[in-house]
Amino acid sequence: MAYTAADVKNLRERTGAGMMDCKKALDESGGDFEAAVDALRAKGLAAAAKKSSRTAAEGLVGVAVSGTKGVALEVNSETDFVAKNDQFQDFVRKATEVALNTAAADVEALKAAAYPDGGTVADKLTNNVATIGENQQLRRIKHVAVSNGIVVPYMHNAAATNLGKIGVLVALESEAAADKLEALGKQIAMHIAAAFPLALTADDLDAELIARERKIAAEKAAESGKPAEVQAKMVDGAVAKYAKENALLSQIFVMDNKSTIQQVVDAAGKEAGAKIVLKDYVRFQLGEGIEKEETDFAAEVAAAAGIK
């Protein structure tokens, strides 16, 4: 698998490793980018993989809540210019409300749902593409709900009410007063936006991610030259640290830098006089996991003008 200079540049940005180390890692991995990342980490030449995925895609994330339920929706566009368009923003807002009210389980179900202005959500999307002149697509949707309690929304760097680039929902199960839950939910949502947890608890973490971290830790331990039993403890310790840092309830609260999120929730429940359970959460970051194709603007202009 061949690789390009852009791959080397991206690998340097992703890992912080030197250029020659990045080239060597890509050579050894046959151009496999993720394998090169793992190889650099195993050799101690890269910091832990950044949790933020490449987020070059444009568009908006929308959130909507109604008491004990909430939904997050991501709608992509080709440029940030369209994301600032009133027509596009109105569509994302209304489509998110439709998703909430119809409990659409996925993007296809949402497309088939009735749109407030007539027709279906898919019809309105098609009309938007035609009138705005840029491709747009519904990318993903997720619901959260509690039987008794509240779902709290938060939008980081909001472009408009409940629209922006990072949308968060926090589902709190409790009989505590709504204002207490609202305040707690807002704080936790801000933490989630900043800390990027990968799961609610360590047990909820993707098994493939854990296996990947264990493999990297084992390679690092093997290079230490220490006895097998010591290496095993090193690996277990590294995996446990990874799980603790990436599971929401065990993360250290960014606002006090000492309490875990679970401790923050427990303390809030004690103060409110009712047990509070952080049941679920959603964190949608615009374009997460999507890499936008980079183009050479000068080359595009030359091509359009017929210049070789």
UniProtKB/Swiss-Prot annotation:
UniProt entry keywords in alphabetical sequence: Cytoplasm, Elongation factor, Protein biosynthesis
Location of the protein in the cell: Cytoplasm
Signal peptide (residue range): none
Annotated SUPFAM superfamilies: Elongation factor Ts (EF-Ts), dimerisation domain (SSF54713), UBA-like (SSF46934)
Main location: cytoplasm
Molecular functions (GO terms): translation elongation factor activity
Assigned GO CC terms: cytoplasm
InterPro entries the UniProt entry points to: EF-Ts_dimer_sf, Transl_elong_EFTs/EF1B, Transl_elong_EFTs/EF1B_dimer, Transl_elong_Ts_CS, UBA-like_sf
Pfam families, sorted: EF_TS
Region Involved in Mg(2+) ion dislocation from EF-Tu, residue ranges: 79-82
Function summary: Associates with the EF-Tu.GDP complex and induces the exchange of GDP to GTP. It remains bound to the aminoacyl-tRNA.EF-Tu.GTP complex up to the GTP hydrolysis stage on the ribosome.
NCBIfam families found in the cross-reference section: tsf
Family statement: Belongs to the EF-Ts family.
Name this polypeptide is given: Elongation factor Ts
